[in-house]
């Protein structure tokens, strides 16, 4: 896959900029604060629809603008050219178009553009807690198979519902709440085991490269 051209509109510090890229190694050189990392962030956003800096959508929109646009011309491994356009709003409710056709779900874009980002923050994989390593594995699973994104979202949804129930009960569960908790626990075990299995398989695939 090749990103042939990248256009940014009101993304971070870019009011409007277009970058023509070629195959091979590309080096971006500039002064501090000119937007080198922002350029990499835009490419990464096309891949996972989130920032590798772990910031909200509001931070990606240039000051004074209502929305940001990332537009890319890509060539896939079969030589086919596609135009991808991602709109980012301050509320996070943007839209995605592929070849001028709007996707019903923004997350249907996952898997179209594949990137691998390495930054100093990635040292948290070693120095940080287990949550950082789980997030890394989950991101990799989604990159390998987009169906894993739905599984990850379901785990997050069930966990959120379960924790909300416990918080509302304040440690005092009546009969109805206990039944509901059992339902959420069973669902969490089900989807959690599927996600855990995917993580274990991925770790086994990575072992020859990190051992």
List each model region and its residues.
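An accessory alpha-helical subdomain
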Residues: 124-210
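Generic alpha-helix structural propensity
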Residues: 23, 34, 38, 55, ...
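Pre-Walker A-like glycine/lysine-rich segment at the N-terminus of P-loop NTPase domains
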Residues: 1-45
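Basic side chains
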Residues: 12, 36, 53, 62, ...
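Short, mixed-charge, low-aromatic patches
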Residues: 1, 14-18, 90-97, 168
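Glycine-centered flexibility sites
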Residues: 24, 30-35, 64, 100, ...
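Nucleotide-state sensing region of NTPase/ATPase domains
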Residues: 44-132, 136-148, 208
């Amino acid at each position: 896959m090749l990103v042939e051209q990248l256009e940014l509109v009101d993304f971070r510090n870019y009011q409007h900029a277009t970058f023509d890229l070629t195959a091979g190694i590309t080096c971006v050189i500039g002064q501090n604060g000119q937007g080198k990392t922002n350029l990499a962030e835009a490419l990464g956003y096309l891949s996972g629809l989130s920032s590798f800096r772990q910031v909200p959508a509001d931070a990606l929109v240039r000051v004074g603008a209502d929305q940001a646009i990332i537009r890319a011309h890509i060539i896939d491994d079969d030589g086919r050219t596609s135009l991808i356009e991602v709109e980012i709003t301050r509320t996070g409710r943007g839209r995605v178009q592929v070849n001028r056709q709007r996707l019903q779900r923004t997350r249907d874009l996952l898997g179209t553009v594949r990137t691998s980002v390495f930054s100093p923050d990635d040292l948290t994989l070693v120095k940080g807690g287990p949550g950082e390593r789980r997030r890394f594995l989950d991101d990799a699973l989604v990159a390998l198979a987009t169906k894993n994104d739905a599984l990850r979202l379901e785990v997050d949804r069930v966990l959120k519902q379960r924790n909300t129930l416990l918080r509302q009960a304040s440690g005092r569960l009546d009969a109805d709440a206990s039944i509901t908790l059992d339902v959420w626990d069973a669902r969490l075990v089900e989807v959690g085991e599927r996600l855990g299995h995917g993580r274990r398989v991925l770790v086994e695939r990575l072992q020859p490269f990190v051992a």
